[in-house]
C-alpha cells in the first residue's frame, strides 16, 4: 500500500480512485493532482514509480485535507452556533440546516421517533 499524506491508499485501484480515500480529496481534486503530476489516471497505484509517488505527495500537500479540514469544518459550525444565526440554531437543535421540510421527514437528522401519549377520551 502506498502512503500519501499519512494515509494508506489501495494499491490495486486506479490512481484517481485511490486518491479519493484521502478525506478532502474527491474525484475532481484527484484528477487535478494527476494532471499536475503528468500521470495517467488509469494507471494502478502499484505500477507508479517512487518519483511519481513523490510528485503526487508534493502536489497533495497544497490541499487542505484530513485533520486540518475536519477542524476547519467544525470551527465553522461552532462559529455559526456562537453567532446564533439561523443555521447555527438549526445545528444546535439537531434539525436540518438547508431548508428541508421537517413535518413528515428529516428522521436522519432528528433521530428516532419520540412517542408522545395522546389525550385519553372520557366516556
Curated annotation (Swiss-Prot):
Keyword terms, alphabetized: Ribonucleoprotein, Ribosomal protein, RNA-binding, rRNA-binding, tRNA-binding
The keyword Ribonucleoprotein is assigned to this record: yes
GO MF assignments: rRNA binding; structural constituent of ribosome; tRNA binding
Domain of life assignment: Bacteria
Family, as annotated: Belongs to the universal ribosomal protein uS13 family.
Summary of subunit composition and partner proteins: Part of the 30S ribosomal subunit. Forms a loose heterodimer with protein S19. Forms two bridges to the 50S subunit in the 70S ribosome.
Name of the molecule in the record: Small ribosomal subunit protein uS13
Species of the source: Mycoplasmopsis agalactiae (strain NCTC 10123 / CIP 59.7 / PG2) (Mycoplasma agalactiae)
